Amino acid sequence: HKSVKELLGENIKNSDFTEKTWYYKQEHGQEFEIEVADFKVSYKDNELKVDFGTSGYGRDNRKYKVNIENVEIVFDSSSIELFANDGSFTLSTRFYPNNHNVKISANNYVAQKLGKIEIREEN
């Protein structure tokens, strides 16, 4: 998403890693599954699923029927921002994982570290 372009860092080459703040991008409507501890977001057969596990503190899992052509996801230590189909479908949620062990099951994707947002006071 254009709001994170300036924050993009180096590529993450492994499908298993422990970054807290990172970016995921995939084109061509392919299926994917991303796990952060016991939180999971996945897409298969035109269904986007969000499974919170214990990271959601009792919140219900979510399912959306949507045909995803492209997706960008921003993860930080306790939130996810998902932009599908050039932003025509969006999803934001909080989650509270007990660790940041990430596992990606997907093909033809890009994962990148994200830099920190600096908030400065203007004089």
Where are these regions (language model features)?
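Beta-rich accessory regions
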Residues: H1-N123
